[in-house]
Amino acid sequence: MLLTRVPAVALCAVIFSGLFSSVLSAADLEGSRDLDIVPRLADAEIVDFRPAAELERVYPMGSIRKISGQLRFDGQVSARGNLTSVTYQLPAEHTSDDAFTAAREALQQQGAELLFWCQARDCGESSLWANEVFGNAKLFGADDRQAYLLLRMAEPRSDTLVALYSITRGNRRAYLHVEQFEAAAPLGELLPTSATLLRQLKSTGKLELPRLAGEPQEAWVTLISRGLNLDSSLRLIVSGVSASAWRDALIGKGVRAARLETGALDGKGLKIEVIR
């Protein structure tokens, strides 16, 4: 029997073809269009579209709340640039989680780096996300049926941010909101939150950090160790050219040595995988 190896990219294209559609829906808002970096979920309809406009944009990197009339969150990314957004109403056969996951995976396949990821009540109040952050009342729904993700695209588009927000409303209608922000000036170094690293690790089984190709960087060691110590039950394999040095650095920050094994000493950057 002849076995043919299918390239990963081709295999993913086959998988996603059942989820995504490039065909515009007749019910789409007039003048709207898809964003080139996030394919449309099959049978989804565009119900809100805002063409590129230059503005100052603030993206939360923490649970949001309102105190004395002011929106509060632990961290943020703020910059001036061009913002384009599209909101999809999803077909009944797909949940908001389906759309969110498919969009996230499509962006990660393009090398996008996750900066902040929250789900359900960890995000704060849906009404604040809908009205204060995105200015779109269609996105107001149940606090426990929401998800938000902020990503940074890979080179050569590293000054592009993408925000995803999914929600299921009380009437069970599900929506996915996507924003593409092109910064007018270089964004510089942006670090993810420790909780986001842990969520990514537990959701996908791995962390791939190609930019961390050299010796351990103090800021990253601190972030990763804090994330790993949020769930001490995980056992992990650390791989990469400097895997041994990273393992030692993480142990030095309080991660138990028994939890960490050293994997292959090659590859691009740093890779951490969950031992199943």
Regions found by a protein language model. Give the residues of each.
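Generic structural signal for beta-strand residues in well-ordered domains
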Residues: 17-19, 229
